[in-house]
Amino acid sequence: MNKVNILPSDTNIKITLFSEVSVGISANSVLFFAHLCMFFEENRSKPIDLCIAFLSLTQLMLLVTMGLIAADMFMSQGIWDSTTCRSIIYFHRLLRGFNLCAACLLHILWTFTLSPRSSCLTKFKHKSPHHISCAFFSLCVLYMLFSSHLFVLIIATSNLTSDHFMYVTQSCSILPMSYSRTTMFSLVMVTREAFLISLMALFSGYMVTLLWRHKKQVQHLHSTSLSSKSSPQQRATRTILLLMSFFVVLYILDIVIFQSRTKFKDGSMFYSLHIIVSHSYATISPFVFIFSDKRIIKFLGSMSGRIINICLFSDGYGP
């Protein structure tokens, strides 16, 4: 494994990757802080705020670990030992799974929250945040159990040049597996992720169907006094569809690029594209949440006003 040849040589790829990580960390930090504050400050806190906070925190940690991995790819001399490699790479793989679990749980909770009173899902609307937290961490534990084999396969290979290892960073690689074990683990991974994505699609489709029927009923009853302004339910539905469509497209691209990388023996371009695409959702999705929720915009505006007042007061311009 000639790591000099495997490393991406295009400076634009490095800039794109580090920019994606930096922007994603900033956006998820803002989203996490805003929803956490709103959850504790509002008189009637919404469980969905806690779920979005979970998602943003997961994506924040995912991008931080990706930043460490990128630093070892481009700026390190292969100084990580096996313990460091296993800890960081395994934790990064787990966070990718946690991100999928959190996104799936968010879509399900969103459907419960927006369901009309006549829906069979109404009884789930007022579940406490404790139930939401338990569901999230249960999914995470299952993912940890299913991914535990990766901790054994990740080793430090800073001085090895074998073509049998799968390159990860300058310091770390993944040990080769037999065809049967590779097939088995791949089948488990595909089944697990296909199940979660199917749940997301099912609940998103159910929500869209309910809101479409509700819109038809409203048009029938108030055909002469329709407003061109979209309702909060319609805006939420568009957000759900946008996030769901974006997630599925990126997931398909992720699979195609990963398979291409395997076919072309760890080509540097495919490896770089795989990293960028697989972290695009974590970078872009917080902007969708921020700009689709007026509460966050108002909250950020009020926080900016407080910071400006504090700065003016500390400089002696206050009363």
UniProtKB/Swiss-Prot annotation:
Q: Which residues form a coiled coil?
A: none
Disulphide linkage map: 85-172
Protein's membrane topology: Multi-pass membrane protein
Task: Indicate which residues are glycosylated according to the record.
Answer: 159
Spell out the SUPFAM superfamilies in the cross-references: Family A G protein-coupled receptor-like (SSF81321)
The transmembrane residues are: 20-40, 50-70, 94-114, 135-155, 194-214, 239-259, 270-290
Gene Ontology molecular function, alphabetical: pheromone receptor activity
Predominant location category: membrane
State the source organism's domain of life. Eukaryota
Example GO CC term: the record gives: plasma membrane
Residues exposed to the Extracellular side: 1-19, 71-93, 156-193, 260-269
InterPro entries recorded for this chain?
A: GPCR_Rhodpsn_7TM (IPR017452), Vmron_rcpt_1 (IPR004072)
For the Cytoplasmic compartment, the record's topological domain ranges are 41-49, 115-134, 215-238, 291-319
Location of the protein in the cell: Cell membrane
Q: Which UniProt keywords apply?
A: Cell membrane, Disulfide bond, G-protein coupled receptor, Glycoprotein, Membrane, Pheromone response, Receptor, Transducer, Transmembrane, Transmembrane helix
GO BP: response to pheromone; sensory perception of chemical stimulus
Entry function = Putative pheromone receptor implicated in the regulation of social as well as reproductive behavior.
Assigned protein family: Belongs to the G-protein coupled receptor 1 family.
Protein name as it appears in the record = Vomeronasal type-1 receptor 96
